[in-house]
Design a protein with these regions (language model features):
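Charge-dense, helix-prone N-terminal extensions
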Residues: 1-102
Length: 102
């Protein structure tokens, strides 16, 4: 998966808008973060703690949680080595999480 694929998937989610402050893309639903580009091969995706724990167990080569995100509802996806379907599912789950805040 490439960042363009993330843009396509996230952009297809109703109400999600992309901006690129400082040259890195971020996708938000009504101002609430869905995902943010860290570099060309990684995005951080919003995820509740239960979902995060689940994807870390199921897809350890795709998702990780660096120390700086341990206390936050976020998971990092490796676009170059990760499972495309799992990343797409995580983006949709992030959108559902943010929609639930309406």
């Amino acid at each position: 998966m490439k960042i363009d694929d993330v843009a396509r998937v996230a952009g297809a989610l109703k109400g999600v808008r992309c901006t690129a402050p400082h040259g890195l893309a971020q996708w938000r639903y009504h101002g609430r973060l869905v995902a943010r580009q860290l570099d060309d091969a990684h995005v951080v995706i919003r995820a509740d703690f239960d979902y995060r724990d689940s994807v870390l167990r199921q897809f350890p080569g795709t998702f990780s949680v660096p120390t700086r995100y341990i206390k936050h509802m976020m998971v990092v996806a490796d676009l170059a080595r990760g499972d495309d379907g799992a990343i797409e599912d995580a983006l949709e789950a992030a959108w559902q999480l943010q929609r639930g805040a309406d």
